[in-house]
Amino acid sequence: IVEKLPIANQVTIARQCDGDSQLDNDSQDKIFPFDTTGIQETLLNGQTDVTTYYYDENDVFIGNTLPAIFETGSQTIRIKVENNTTLKCSAETTLEFIVDDSPEVYDVIIPINCDDGVSDIDGYSEFNTSEVIQILLTNPNTSQTQSLDDFSVSFNFIDEDGNTVDANTLPNPFNTKTQNVVATVTNKLNSNCSITKDINFTVVPLPVIKENLIKIEQCDDGRGSENDGVTMHDLTQVESLFSDDFQNEIFEYFTDLNLTEKILDPSSFYNDPLYDEVWLKITTANGCERISKTQNGTDRLKIEI
């Protein structure tokens, strides 16, 4: 008797990214819940009166069929199709499961910059991006960094000319207005395994100065020697003349050009006899400051008394 051999038809299953399933809560355990629906049907292709046997990579028996959801790491299993006869003639094939690493990304916090550079009213500032990739790929809890041998990084951003750019690094320094840069990390073996992260670059304006010089003229208060040229001034009353946003800004007053001698109580300031000068520094809520009306200008902020 010559018995016809069964046929173990070739079966395949798509490689998967770790964690890329609602059933997979751990994207770093290298195990994926594969949906094996259809494997048995493809394997037999209509054959009957046969029994199938599935063995893992260590030749441990899994079952006569695979579970509908088969949780496994990367491995190649062996499948035997055997006739239900006394001769038990059989044929074999293999099925490869591949679980690819999914990248992880971590928060990259870029400190806010004040408008600066060639112009300090154009909304641009230069940012140091030398450590962006390192921070993006490094787990802050374990200090473990994903290797660029395994993963690629790309950035989508708008350059100084308004062009949308895709590049594997950010310019350094990165001269930009406020924008969200999208970083994408991808497994080099499987481009489906990728993740994105927004990196926020924020440029905030400096104080907008209306006038850099305010003159205060006031009658002698008559205290002390008559007409001694000394009187008390509330310097804070002129803040609105310097800036429209004065209520949201911090004003500091100094008696010297180098801003080393601070006036502790500007609401009760006695001037030097007959003529005095007070120098100012104005700071926004974001910490951006001006001491002159224009960038590095000689038009210093000053009160003349």
Where are these regions (language model features)?
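Extracellular low-complexity Ser/Thr/Asn/Gly-rich intrinsically disordered segments
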Residues: 1-305
